[in-house]
A protein has these predicted regions:
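N-terminal glycine-rich FAD/FM-binding segment characteristic of electron-transfer flavoproteins
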Residues: 1-357
Length: 357
């Protein structure tokens, strides 16, 4: 909210945002700003060109179009930081106070945040037993993994549940069942129409999926309702009155337990579509020079391909292959990671897999 007040003071034609902030990784700033500024919004933009009446954009789905000012644009691809030029170092930095932007002090800082982190703890939810094998045992390990299949991870249910939980779209239903007695599914609509449905329906909580459309729509609706939104939740619980949300934090090394201070609490939850491929090979930056060989092996064993964010940001592989906290979630019987460090942000997208090699 305070950021929008500062931007209004500057009266820009376009506001450019990254995919997500460096502190929260939630991807809410751009969509929320668009609502508070009453600007148009385009998300997941890969390229921009000047056009007669504004800008022409292409997004990660290879769709494109024109957008005119004023607008908020979130950029999908990260850019390498450049050393500041000598000229920029001598430029004055303008500091705006709360008074300068006419901000309500009671809504600044932690006091104004609609969500609260109640506690954090070490993330050990994805620990598995590990066996070291020699390279000649690879095909054996794949065959064993296929025989074993995967055990579907079912979220733990709370003993006491909220009376009415809404899902925007059907993908969050399994999560909703763990915390809600009565589940209502509504179809995604415009941000204004969706917000109005929620405002008049008075649900105890609203859940969203982790698809691109939901991640753009949910922050807009949260801003319209002046309520909190917790992103990329991996678990939910309730005591029958309050919804508690769990999500990875600090690069995924810890899990944060979060509560909404406003009503209704909203959350996007990590959901996975049923995988067509029983085997998926994930390609990381460490294997960037061997993509052709890996693709040939994948074709030989009838496997799909996935990628880490660094591989897609570096233009080695297309964005639709990205798996992880800021990508999609996959759940094959066998996931083969090649050149991947195993950062928790990537693991978040493969935790429903059967055997990981």
């Amino acid at each position: 909210m305070q950021l929008s007040l500062a931007i209004k003071r500057l009266c820009p034609d376009f506001v450019f945002c990254g995919r997500q902030s460096v502190d929260g990784d939630t991807g809410q700033v751009g969509p929320s700003l668009a609502v508070r500024l009453e600007f148009s919004l385009v998300t997941n933009v890969m390229s921009l060109e000047s056009a007669e009446n504004g800008l022409f954009y292409t997004d990660r789905s290879e769709n494109g179009g024109n957008i005119s000012a004023p607008a908020v644009i979130t950029l999908e691809k990260s850019r390498r930081l450049r050393l500041p030029s000598i000229r920029s170092k001598i430029k004055p930095v303008e500091t705006l106070s709360a008074n300068d932007i006419n901000a309500d002090i009671s809504l600044c800082g932690l006091k104004g945040s609609p969500t609260r982190v109640l506690k954090t703890f070490e993330n050990d939810s994805d620990r598995r037993s590990c066996t070291f094998i020699s390279p000649d045992k690879l095909m054996w390990a794949i065959e064993e993994g296929l025989k074993k299949g995967r055990q579907k991870i079912k979220p733990a249910e709370s003993a006491n549940k909220l009376k009415n939980v809404w899902c925007v779209g059907s993908s969050p239903i399994e999560f909703a069942k763990t915390v809600g007695e009565n589940i209502t599914v509504i179809d995604p609509d415009t941000s204004e129409k969706t917000a109005e449905k929620i405002r008049t329906g008075h649900p105890d909580a609203v859940l969203w999926g982790s698809d691109i459309k939901s991640k753009a729509l949910a922050p807009q609706v949260a801003a319209l309702l002046n309520t909190g939104l917790c992103a990329d939740c991996t678990a939910l619980e309730t005591d029958g009155e309050t919804l508690y949300m769990y999500r990875p934090a600090c690069s995924g090394n810890i899990i944060a337990k979060i509560r909404c201070e406003t009503k209704p609490p909203m959350a996007t939850v990590r959901t996975a579509e049923e995988e067509q491929n029983k085997i998926i090979i994930g390609i990381g930056y460490g294997a960037r020079e061997h993509i052709a060989a890996i693709k040939a092996f994948a074709e030989k064993i009838n496997a799909g391909i996935a990628a880490t964010r660094k591989m897609t940001d570096g233009d080695y592989l297309p964005y639709e292959l990205q798996v992880g906290l800021t990508g999609k979630t996959v759940n094959p019987d066998v996931y083969i990671a090649v050149g991947i460090s195993g950062a928790v942000h990537h693991i978040a997208g493969i935790r429903q897999s059967g055997t990981a090699i």
